[in-house]
């Protein structure tokens, strides 16, 4: 209670000592805003037919979240699933993981081993280094290519600041330290900017140490669920089941993370620039919390289950011209290389053998774009190329003797390669003489190829040495926007999307759940979506923006994991036990529909109200019998709150809420993780959250906040770990 009063007092004192002038950076209505994600080039938001949510730098700092996954969830922009604390898998319009595209500074993060279940790669994006983020809803394949079925989350990192006219050098920076009580979080961030007239650089480094996550203790809308009553540990050379002295602490969920950004920009003249962009993220081992709670014959199934350090390296060079001949909107070319290292390690309770499976992915990319503008029209065109090289290794170690023995790899042991090359063009135009109407079109076409080789057949006698695919791809979009003088906006958008099978889809061998194993199927083909949006928005005097969007998506040739026969058998011996054979197959048609409503209102110069609501429904279409529920469909969720702000102080309070998900609306044996939910399904939940900040002087600011004010015990749908309980946060920021 003392902590509660202290944090509340800090938040309220910010209001008491604030100055009268208005801080416009924290306004919620931004009428003249431009967005980049929809067409990969800057465009007025009012002219974009596709639904877009923008998270600006001031809002990112105000939310003050621990990871990029938490940023997306706390903002209410998307639903986020978690299997462990070091994770976060965004869901956009009923699509998740490899069906949602992640983009950083215009470069695809998705690679050839992004899986269709749940992912945690988003946490390798340092949210403390972000300038903004844009969430694009609905298929975005025309602009970005494969994987953007449900949409795209586009991150834009901070850019260095140049010296102004008359200055020889401009330097500055900022640093902060944050503490959070629910997981004993300790995060430190430092950022330095040095800029001259022609060269400028920014360096940012973040270190985070997260302890075991404490869940809430108040049951909210349902019975208590998810307590960690027992855990496995090794004592005296033997696996032992121990009683957790505090069952609200989710034992073995903590981890550490390190993030680095270095960006250097050289401007030889006013028309051209060269940018070197280097990003590196790594972590400690990350415990797979949900698997560590799986029951087994001796109490728990696993003694160890963790991801090894998750490493992401990005090195990119970008050349840009403001104008180049006919292309008066400029040209840009980005050459990039990414290296991703992932591993997973598991050992069953009482078994001295631990399995190690390691993956390395190298990704080379080239993106070129050119823009042309006329009086009432604009056009953007470009070329995309990516090449993925996947190497997979595995072994089994006896932790008692140190003996190393062979083990089957997660992906083809002979390596896998995947390429895609495509050209795209987008065009928009305003009707001359009636500029209330804006029309847009887009088209992408190209080819993708994949090859995976199976060398060692010790564990699986595959009837083939390699699997190959070569596929033509295409997508298109068509939009119309009407902006009336009275403040009404009508947007119509039709688009298609695609996702080509990657190495994970085609060549993976692993256990999706105990007692089953997924084997390769070289005959799968791309997934496709066809989408239609209707958006109605009311804008009033730059004080109110109320957006409502209805949408429907037809999902065709969906890749699903289903029963399969391998060498004529429906079961094989895998990891020491007979397992049901499954494989990815194009066996599903589905329909997904829903709506969203977003309200932003600057009620007074210093007071804003906001709210968002998202509803999604998905059904698998059956040729015979009743339709089935589609997995990855979240319950209704949303966010509602207020923000009071001045140049020195701000206070923000909001509710995050999720509806319930009945167990009958889960897809049996799908990706909804019904085994980690109560018997009747996932209960509804709501958390109250409060943030406050006060700037004492130009160089010093204090932020304080309380997440989950009422210490509600809850678990997000499809997740394998409970959400954090009451979390006191305090952050000290220094700028120079």
For the regions a protein language model found, what residue spans apply to each?
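Outer membrane beta-barrel strand-and-loop segments of large Gram-negative receptors
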Residues: 359, 363-369, 418-422, 519-525, ...
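N-terminal periplasmic accessory domains that precede
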Residues: 68-71, 88-91, 103, 120-123, ...
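Short acidic/polar hinge/loop motifs at secondary-structure boundaries
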Residues: 109-139
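Flexible loop and strand-edge segments within Gram-negative outer membrane beta-barrel domains
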Residues: 21, 251-257, 267, 271-328, ...
